[in-house]
Amino acid sequence: LHATVLETPTPHPQNGTHCLDYSLLYNVALLEYLKETGDKEVALDLWPVVVRQIEMALRQYSDDWIYDMQKKPIYWLVFDWKDNYDRQASMQGLTAFSLEKSYELAKMLGKEKEAGDWPRIAGQIKKAARKTFYDQKNGVIVSGPNRQVSYLSQVWMILSETLTAKEGAKAMATV
């Protein structure tokens, strides 16, 4: 999905602006839309976009299921506008969260076969996240080479259920 759509002189996307974290949230928003409205026709029309967002995100993962911040193409990740915020752990949690919500959408649309691997992949991403980003000694998620600790990284690992409720509560209290 394009990160920016301009209205003038006529509606058009701004080429070259793809915000991968927002693209994954599109899938979650479509699930919420379907749950709220029951509008299966629109959700089915937009289903190929959901699949594409997952495909784009998964291409950015290493063989050991860690989001690779240097893998081409390097997508714009917003999460927070803070310049020195390390986004790797947040992206890891968001991808797992989006995969699970996208699979829930697939089930509602009768598209389970197309999305059949998504729960397994989400599990692998979460397992890799715990191994790579979870600092057991301090009970927090760390991100990037400097092992940055942030509320946002904790939140995405909590939302994705990479951390248990107890671990999440401790992490948030520790940050």
Where are these regions (language model features)?
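Active-site core of glycosidic bond-cleaving carbohydrate-active enzymes
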Residues: 1-175
